[in-house]
Amino acid sequence: MKKTAIALALASAVALTACGNDEPDGTDTGMEDPTVSQWEQPEVRGPLQDTDQEDVDKVAHDVVEQIFSWSPKDDHTIADAARKAEPLMDEDFAYNNRDSWAGMFKVPGKQWASWVNDNATTSVELTEGLEERPEDTDMEARRQYSVEVTIKGDKQEQKLRYDVFAHFNNLGWWRLDNITISQPQTMS
């Protein structure tokens, strides 16, 4: 029985050696190098289509400016401008705030209607706040702006100023994921 076990072990060793590769050691190239693919910015349509989504400063400026780019002549409600900025917002944030924008601006519907009736147009001026804030990381950034909206109609002109605090996250591309908008201050 011992001789049979030894013979079987010897036969197995010879068989395994015969199945080996004839190439000398060190010639196996291993796995092929992976194909390098580059990420392309997600396509954004509308007024923010040219925004560089890798630049948090550009995203922050363009999103905040668009949120306040009200168009009483063309838009149904004051919230339409913010909805146009949704492509550069975090999906959950955009969804959760879709019905809240008019309330965030604190402009009554009656005021919006008066701007519509006055054929008003708006212009927006942003000034970045340079107050101390947490440093940007690869994944998040914060920005603060003073936003002045000038509403000019056929019969009246009005200026509103807001303080805006915005938080952005980076999950491949910068997106607005939180915003705080102050009470409007009427400017003379």
Language model regions located:
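Juxtamembrane and targeting peptides
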Residues: 2-72
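Structured, amphipathic secondary-structure segments that form assembly/contact surfaces
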Residues: 75-188
